[in-house]
């Protein structure tokens, strides 16, 4: 492939990224990392991928602990997080962790998004532990996440913006550190979102996967979206999400042991418990949610 060519140079790298940006997609951070991974020794990718696989559950646990206001060394949090990830469908885990392109665009960007949120969570839930030096890793992580996957960029920017507004409402002051990270995230996401290649890629994807897409009504779009969300939960992501919900239950129980009298804890624990049970329904032979979205081709008949 062109990426592996021994004649590739820094000039060609810029040409390659420019070609991808103009003709296919705006995911420049992911494309650049893929380029470097293919041009380097395979062990570079293996080491970084292993690091990302470790940092993903660690980051999720840290965010959950900050949100719950609990610091714990309970091993069950780690077991729930890691097991939920590694027990996902073999194809899903393979695409996200073992396949080079997939790991870079999905696992790496998701991990970077999680770690970009660490200082945001500190400012919102645990201000005294926020350190400005966190920006040295958070901002690069925000750039990678928001310039690798559209959904991650949108979610990250939304959470950062909500944090800015919340801190102003609560403290009547603006955190310039958070504003800086939010501005960088917005700029990186704009670079991705405004890529000329996006329109070409969308046209190609529509032709290949759903030719009737342009003629769908708003209701049909909404129906498909709901079906795919449920299908994604009930098939690919059920155990990963179940692991996260179990972490939430464990942390809220610990908070209650520490003397918390917040009645909403019981409500959130109840919701998390319900979703955890629902995620296990396919193992009991109940596939009503797993089957949703599987035969979406006849959407025009709805």
How would you describe each model-predicted region?
Residues 1-8, 12:
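Single conserved hydrophobic/aromatic residue that forms the stacking wall/gate
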Residues 19-43, 47-50:
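Short hydrophobic/aromatic helix or loop-helix immediately within or flanking a transmembrane segment
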Residues 50-77, 115:
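Transmembrane-helix motifs of polytopic, lipid-linked glycan transferases
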Residues 56-62, 168, 238-265:
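Hydrophobic, aromatic-rich transmembrane alpha-helices
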Residues 74-124, 282-302:
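Membrane-interface micro-motifs in multi-pass membrane enzymes
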Residues 122-144, 176-179:
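Short hydrophobic alpha-helices at membrane interfaces in multi-pass membrane enzymes
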Residues 133-156, 161:
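Membrane-interface alpha helices of multi-pass inner-membrane proteins
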Residues 155-186:
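Perimembrane helix-loop-helix junctions
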């Amino acid at each position: 492939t062109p990426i592996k060519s021994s004649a590739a140079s820094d000039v060609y790298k810029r040409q390659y990224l420019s070609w991808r940006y103009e003709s296919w997609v705006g995911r420049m951070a992911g494309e650049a990392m893929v380029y470097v991974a293919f041009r380097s020794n395979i062990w570079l990718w293996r080491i970084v991928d292993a690091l990302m696989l470790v940092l993903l559950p660690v980051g999720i646990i840290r965010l959950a602990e900050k949100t719950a206001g609990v610091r714990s060394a309970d091993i069950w949090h780690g077991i729930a997080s890691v097991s939920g990830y590694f027990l996902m469908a073999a194809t899903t885990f393979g695409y996200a962790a073992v396949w080079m392109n997939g790991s870079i665009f999905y696992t790496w960007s998701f991990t970077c998004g999680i770690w970009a949120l660490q200082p945001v969570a500190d400012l919102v839930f645990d201000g005294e532990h926020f350190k400005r030096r966190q920006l040295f890793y958070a901002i690069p992580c925000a750039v990678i996440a928001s310039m690798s996957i559209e959904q991650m960029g949108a979610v990250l920017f939304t959470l950062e913006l909500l944090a800015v507004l919340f801190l102003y409402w609560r403290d009547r002051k603006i955190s310039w550190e958070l504003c800086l990270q939010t501005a960088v995230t917005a700029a990186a996401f704009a670079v991705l979102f405004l890529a000329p290649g996006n329109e070409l890629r969308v046209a190609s994807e529509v032709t290949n996967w759903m030719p009737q897409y342009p003629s769908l009504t708003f209701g049909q779009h909404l129906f498909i979206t709901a079906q795919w969300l449920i299908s994604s939960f009930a098939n690919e992501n059920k155990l990963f999400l179940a692991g996260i919900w179990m972490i939430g239950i464990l942390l809220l129980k610990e908070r209650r042991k520490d003397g918390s009298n917040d009645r909403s804890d019981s409500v959130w624990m109840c919701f998390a418990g319900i979703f955890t049970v629902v995620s296990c329904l396919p193992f009991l032979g109940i596939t009503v949610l797993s089957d949703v979205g599987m035969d979406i081709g006849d959407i025009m008949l709805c």
